[in-house]
Amino acid sequence: MPDHDSTALLSRQTKRRRVDIGVKRTVGTASAFFAKARATFFSAMNPQGSEQDVEYSVVQHADGEKSNVLRKLLKRANSYEDAMMPFPGATIISQLLKNNMNKNGGTEPSFQASGLSSTGSEVHQEDICSNSSRDSPPECLSPFGRPTMSQFDVDRLCDEHLRAKRARVENIIRGMSHSPSVALRGNENEREMAPQSVSPRESYRENKRKQKLPQQQQQSFQQLVSARKEQKREERRQLKQQLEDMQKQLRQLQEKFYQVYDSTDSENDEDGDLSEDSMRSEILDARAQDSVGRSDNEMCELDPGQFIDRARALIREQEMAENKPKREGSNKERDHGPNSLQPEGKHLAETLKQELNTAMSQVVDTVVKVFSAKPSRQVPQVFPPLQIPQARFAVNGENHNFHTANQRLQCFGDVIIPNPLDTFGSVQMPSSTDQTEALPLVVRKNSSEQSASGPATGGHHQPLHQSPLSATAGFTTPSFRHPFPLPLMAYPFQSPLGAPSGSFSGKDRASPESLDLTRDTTSLRTKMSSHHLSHHPCSPAHPPSTAEGLSLSLIKSECGDLQDMSDISPYSGSAMQEGLSPNHLKKAKLMFFYTRYPSSNMLKTYFSDVKFNRCITSQLIKWFSNFREFYYIQMEKYARQAINDGVTSTEELSITRDCELYRALNMHYNKANDFEVPERFLEVAQITLREFFNAIIAGKDVDPSWKKAIYKVICKLDSEVPEIFKSPNCLQELLHE
């Protein structure tokens, strides 16, 4: 018996292990084995009826095996589902074992000690009793005389066994075919059953199974993120393309706007030019009509060459005016097409041509009339409203120097007497090879003077720049006389439109001397002389002063080629002047040979013929500042040139009257070379040159203020200015000497 019990126990444990690891159990084989064992047991106990019992049990087992299994499966199918619902996340075997422990823990001590052994024996008893419970209940007794289990316990154990097998299959199927929806439902059930926590082993198994669930969710999330990024990238590309298109359209709009704006400006400029030409032609026509009514005796003293020059100027002006509309029309056709010329522009062009032709014919007729008149007969004035200065031809005809002076003044004719037709041109600032001097002071007329000279000017606009020829209106020259009223001579450079009159349209009109002269003279006038003329009419007892005195002596002093005109005195009068003249500029240049840093008191002493004020003083100081600037520039230039030539000592540097530096300085301050430069100036120039040489050799020119030390040395080398410079007629006296 003990051997039989130990063998049965081992078979039960082996069977239980096979159930735990999922090995399929053959029901028929196990039942036959147990049936044989039971038959042997009963035959030993009851030899008489053993054979009958064995046969009966075998038959009973063979007939009822399949029916019992099907019946139990169908009977407990619903109860299995109900039992599985409360434990969705736990292992079925663990739940069954736990239930068995709770149910049998108090009645079977052997089960508490060894759960696996008890369970195995119960299952074995279940198999035995389930086959013979209906026909032979007394036979299902334990060897120890223990009564067999009730039908309910047998059914329960069988149901639990089948439920465990089915749970294994379900777990396998569930692990293989999990979906996101199933995982989501499992998570919800887990949250609902969170209070019913299980053992750590069960939790580990559950977590291990759940770690595999979010893979599909993670993949779908990554796909969603990548799709979203691709969508954003596409939107960004489209926005960038739209921005580029808008920028391109903006550039096109800007180009169109600039084209329209430029075309509008060009049309306005052309219209303005045409209107200006039309106005000028109307003015010329009016002047020509006025000239017809003049008496012939007003031009008895005029130079016939003047009319030839005027005729030539008008011819050139007509040619330029006729060519200008053609050029403008060709430009407009090239830019905007052949039909873009407006009717107004065509009308203005035609009007301009007609007016120019009319004016030209009238001028030619007038010139022919003048030359066809008898010598003793006085011819009418051609252009009295122009108020042209007559410096070229206002000299007395009996003077033997007239023709010579007139010929020598040809190069300065346009400077002293500008063409009235050139007053419409633009003013070009002349350039000179010498250092640019400060522009002379400009003094404009006040309202009282304009009203006083209004009838004489014919109601024309006052010019911005007045003539320097009026500076000598207070001086008299008995050998000259002029037929025109003095108020007309006070403003010889006036133009009807008030434009500046010092224009240069030709390349051969200005030499360096004339350019420098014009720069210093075209913007000068004297208020004192104009005021004097407006209050002192012409009378035989007091002949009016003329403009030739200043202009001719000015040219003589600047150019030095009019020695026969040296007897003309620009300071024959003693009236005070309120402005600076070119003679004052010449005087200041000569004074620079003696003093480089004059004080304001010295200037007032040596320019006694000028009524000083703040502007006059500032202008004189500015002149000397420009003189010094040119002086120092030349010194530095020749000092560096000497260093480049290899000069190493200051003893090798000297200035003589034959050196190039002296000629440059003399040409600037004494252009006519009619003044003898004092020896003291040569000494000062030599000291200055050596100072610059030493400073450059020592490397002091790196400092921006390195010249200040030289200035301090040179300012102490000023010498006394001769007393002759205090006289208003100092230039005449110096030139005579």
Swiss-Prot record:
There is a cross-link at K324 (Glycyl lysine isopeptide (Lys-Gly) (interchain with G-Cter in SUMO2)). The keyword Repressor applies. Residues 577-635 form the Prospero-type homeo domain. Residues 103-147, 178-221, 320-344, 444-476, 525-547 are annotated as: Disordered. The keyword Protein transport does not apply. Residues 636-735 form the Prospero domain. Residues 1-28 are annotated as: Interaction with RORG. Residues 103-135, 464-476 have a biased composition (Polar residues). Residues 577-735 are annotated as: Homeo-Prospero. GO terms for biological process: acinar cell differentiation; aorta smooth muscle tissue morphogenesis; atrial cardiac muscle tissue morphogenesis; blood vessel endothelial cell differentiation; branching involved in pancreas morphogenesis; cell population proliferation; cerebellar granule cell differentiation; circadian rhythm. GO terms for cellular component: cytoplasm; cytosol; nucleoplasm; nucleus. Keywords: Biological rhythms, Developmental protein, DNA-binding, Homeobox, Isopeptide bond, Nucleus, Phosphoprotein, Repressor, Transcription, Transcription regulation, Ubl conjugation. The modification Phosphoserine is found at S177, S179, S199, S291, S295, S511, S514, S557. Induction: Expressed in a circadian manner in the liver with a peak at ZT4. It comes from the Eukaryota. Residues 320-337 have a biased composition (Basic and acidic residues). Residues 723-729 are annotated as: Essential for nuclear localization, interaction with RORG, repression of RORG transcriptional activator activity. GO terms for molecular function: DNA binding domain binding; DNA-binding transcription factor activity; DNA-binding transcription factor activity, RNA polymerase II-specific; DNA-binding transcription repressor activity, RNA polymerase II-specific; LBD domain binding; nuclear receptor binding; RNA polymerase II cis-regulatory region sequence-specific DNA binding; sequence-specific DNA binding. InterPro entries: Homeo_prospero_dom (IPR023082), Homeo_prospero_dom_sf (IPR037131), Homeodomain-like_sf (IPR009057), Prospero_homeodomain (IPR039350). The Prospero-type homeodomain and the adjacent Prospero domain act as a single structural unit, the Homeo-Prospero domain (Potential). The Prospero-type homeodomain is essential for repression of RORG transcriptional activator activity. Belongs to the Prospero homeodomain family. Transcription factor involved in developmental processes such as cell fate determination, gene transcriptional regulation and progenitor cell regulation in a number of organs. Plays a critical role in embryonic development and functions as a key regulatory protein in neurogenesis and the development of the heart, eye lens, liver, pancreas and the lymphatic system. Involved in the regulation of the circadian rhythm. This is Prospero homeobox protein 1. The lineage of its organism: Eukaryota, Metazoa, Chordata, Craniata, Vertebrata. The gene is Prox1.
